[in-house]
Amino acid sequence: MEIRNGEICIGGVSVDEIANTFGTPTYVYDEAKIRENYRSVKNTFEKYYPDFKMFYAVKCCNNPAIVNILRQEGAGADCASVNEILLAKSVGLSGEDVMFSGNFLSDDDIRQGLESGVIFNLDDISILPRLLKFGTPELLSFRINPGYGKSNVGDFVTNAGPGAKFGIHPDKVIEGYRLAKEAGIKRFGAHMMTGSCIT
C-alpha cells in the first residue's frame, strides 16, 4: 500500500476505484508485492543454502491465485489437509513440490497422500506404522519440536516448546528415522515450526 495524490493505493490502484468496481467488502492482493516478498526471502536463504526451496503454508491463505503466483516463483506448497493438496495440484504443483504436514491423519488421508506422491511430514512417530501399511514413500520428513518456541500473541499459538501440540521431541525423532530407514525409505527431511505471529 502507498499514498498517491492523497489516496490510498494498492498495486497502483486507488482503494476508491477498487471499491467502486468490486463493491465492499472485498479482498485485495498485490501480486507484485507477493512476488517481491517471496524473492527477498528466497534470495536471503539461497546465499547460505543454495539448494533452498520454500514451501508456502496454504493454510494461511488458500486463494488458488496466490498459490499459483508462488508456484510460478518456484515455491512448493505445505498442505495441512487433502483438500489443500488438491488445491496445490490444481495450480500445477506435483509430488515433491507438495509437503503434507497434516495432524491426526486418517487412513484415507494417508492413502490419498501416497497416491498424490507428496512428501509426508509426520509430527508423531505413531503415524509411521500406519503410513507404511499403505506404502513406502521415497522421501519422508519429520516435524521436530526443538524444545522452545515463541509467539507474540500468547501461548495458544506457540508451535514448539514444552506442551506444544506440534512436533516430535529430538530424543524420539532419531528412532523415527531409524524405523523409516529400516522400512526402505531412502531420503529424509527435517522440519521445524517454532513460532507464529512473531514480529
Question: What is each of the regions a protein language model found here?
Answer:
Residues 140-145:
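ATP-grasp fold ATP-binding core
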Residues 134, 146-199:
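Active-site loop/helix belt of alpha/beta enzymes
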Residues 1-120, 125-138, 175, 180-188:
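A charged N-terminal "starter" segment
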